[in-house]
Each structure stands twice: as C-alpha cells, then as structure tokens.
C-alpha cells in the first residue's frame, strides 16, 4: 500500500505490540475441568466470556464467576485468574525500543480493548524490561476506562477528539480485521496486521527505516 503523509501512529496492543496466543488460554480452561460435552455446548459462551473479560466492559467478578460455573468442582477464582494471566502474552523488547524511537518523529498512541487487571500486568511487563508507558506512548486509550470498545465508531471519535489527531495522516495498526476495517472507514490509513507479525508489514518497515 502506498502511504500518504503520516504524522500519527495508533497501535492496538494484543497481537500487535505484544505477542498473544488466545488458543492456549482456551486450552488451559479445559484443564480446569470443562468437559468435552461442555466444550461442545458452551464454546460460544466461553469465547464470549473471554471477550468480555479482556475488554473489561462487564464487572470482572461477574465474568470470572460465569467461567467458574463451567469448571470442575473445587476450582477457585484464583485458578482461573492464573490461567488468564497467559493473556498478557510475550512482549518483545525490540518493539518497545522501536516505539521510543518512533516518538521522536511521530505522535504515538495506544488504542486497546483490555481490562484493568491485564493492563496492570502489562505495565509490569514493560517495567521489567526497563520501560514505562509514558516513554512508549504519547497517550493510552483503553476500552475498560473509556467504557466503549473497538470496532464501535465512538471509540475512534473519542481518541480523535481527545488528541486532535488528523485521521487522514494517521497510520493505524490492528490485528482484528473488523477493527482495522472500522478504522479505515473512519478515515485512518489502516493496516490489518497479521497477529504477532507486525514486522512483516511494509507499512511498519517504512516508518522505522529512517528513524535513528
């Protein structure tokens, strides 16, 4: 894709900045006693609960209790929380180094569907690697705090209003096709990222090749 002028970068978090493996988390739920029959009957429910947990738009305790109801007797909320920690994924330090450099040339924002628990754990991951969110991003916009989620048009409108960014000069990276499409429809130069493979995209390669 041929990029127009770029002044602002907006990144999703899971699958773009941090490498994630949702499938491994679902499999880990099976280890808590979700039987084969329940897997078949409740797979949509489990996926809904995972989505609900990640986005943080429903009370976390309520979501965890629904998950607990699907598990074997004797399973605790703590057992489920331990499994869900895997959603924090693996954070490549090279991407964080690149973000710091990109901020010298662009405004850099994070726009993520994520809950408070996962975000706090993600901040700890950044800190362990020697970075703070303020070093990496000019602003952070999270679904649980905004009380809205991608791909709703309202979340793109709000980040635009709060930052003053120009959608036409904004490059937006997201690994969910529906989010990337919504961003494109809003006016962003949108990149549908292959999950966990940001570096493979020409748009990423172009913006980092000239930074020092």
Where are the regions that the model predicts?
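Soluble or luminal CAZymes and related metallo-dependent hydrolases
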Residues: 59, 87-94, 151, 155
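Alpha-helical elements of Rossmann-like donor-binding domains used by nucleotide-donor carbohydrate transfer enzymes
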Residues: 24-27, 48, 62, 66, ...
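Active-site neighborhood of HAD-like aspartate-dependent phosphohydrolases
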Residues: 2-45, 69-70, 185-186, 199
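Generic structural signal for small/hydrophobic residues in well-ordered secondary structure
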Residues: 12-15, 56, 110, 140, ...
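Substrate-recognition element of Asp-dependent hydrolases with the DxDx(T/V) motif
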Residues: 77-127
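Asp-based, Mg2+/Mn2+-dependent phosphohydrolase catalytic module
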Residues: 2-6, 115-116, 122-212
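Helical cap/lid subdomains and adjacent loops of hydrolase enzymes that gate the active-site channel
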Residues: 37-43, 49-52, 80-88
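A metal-dependent, Asp-based hydrolase signature
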Residues: 50-81
């Amino acid at each position: 894709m041929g990029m127009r002028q770029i002044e602002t970068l907006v990144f999703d978090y899971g699958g773009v900045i941090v490498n994630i493996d949702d499938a491994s988390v679902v499999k880990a739920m099976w280890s808590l006693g979700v039987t084969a029959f329940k897997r078949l009957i409740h797979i949509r429910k489990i996926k809904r609960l995972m989505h609900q947990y990640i986005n943080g738009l429903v009370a976390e305790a309520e979501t965890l209790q629904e998950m607990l109801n699907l598990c074997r007797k004797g399973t605790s909320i703590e057992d489920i929380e331990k499994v869900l920690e895997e959603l924090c994924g693996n954070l490549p330090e090279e991407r964080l180094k690149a973000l710091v450099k990109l901020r010298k040339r662009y405004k850099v924002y994070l726009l993520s569907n994520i809950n408070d628990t996962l975000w706090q754990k993600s901040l700890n991951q950044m800190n362990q690697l020697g970075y703070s969110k303020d070093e990496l991003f000019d602003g952070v916009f999270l679904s649980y705090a905004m009380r809205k989620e991608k791909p709703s048009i309202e979340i793109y409108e709000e980040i635009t209003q709060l930052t003053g960014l120009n959608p036409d000069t904004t490059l937006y990276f997201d690994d969910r096709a529906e989010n990337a499409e919504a961003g494109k429809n809003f006016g962003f130069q949108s990149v549908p990222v292959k999950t966990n493979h940001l570096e493979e995209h020409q748009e990423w390669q172009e913006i980092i090749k000239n930074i020092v």
